Amino acid sequence: MSNLVDEFNSDMWTVYTGAKEECNYNATRYLQMISNRGGLATAKKLLAENKSQYGLTALYKCNRLDLTVEALVLKEKYRSLFTEKELKAARKRLGDLHYVPTY
């Protein structure tokens, strides 16, 4: 599972880079969190928060919800890293924005 966690952590960095390059969104808090906690712990923390995520809104406005933590979490290969409650939170947030991942 450690290789899967490493892949997930790497993809969390890719999410940051993609959001910055594609949407000119500089996610400073997100960057600090993945630098300090790692990608998996950051994703779990963000999914546990009940408040609206500014980054999700910014990426929605840019029409790039595929670059969200929620979309990454729902990828088939990463689902085993998360609880059903966390997966449900990711699905709900994306569903509220009428986004359905295509994978």
Q: What positions do the PLM features span?
A:
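Alpha-helix boundary/N-cap detector
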Residues: N3, E7, I34-R37, L81, ...
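Polar/charged alpha-helical tracts
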Residues: S10, Q32, A41, K85-K92
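Amphipathic alpha-helical packing elements
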Residues: Y16-R64
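Acidic/proline-rich low-complexity IDRs
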Residues: N3, G55-A58, D66, A71-V73
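Charged, compositionally biased N-terminal leader segments and the immediate start
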Residues: M1-E22, D96
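Amphipathic alpha-helical binding modules
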Residues: N63-Y103
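Charged, low-complexity surface segments at secondary-structure and domain boundaries
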Residues: M1, T14-G18, R29-Y30, A43-K45, ...
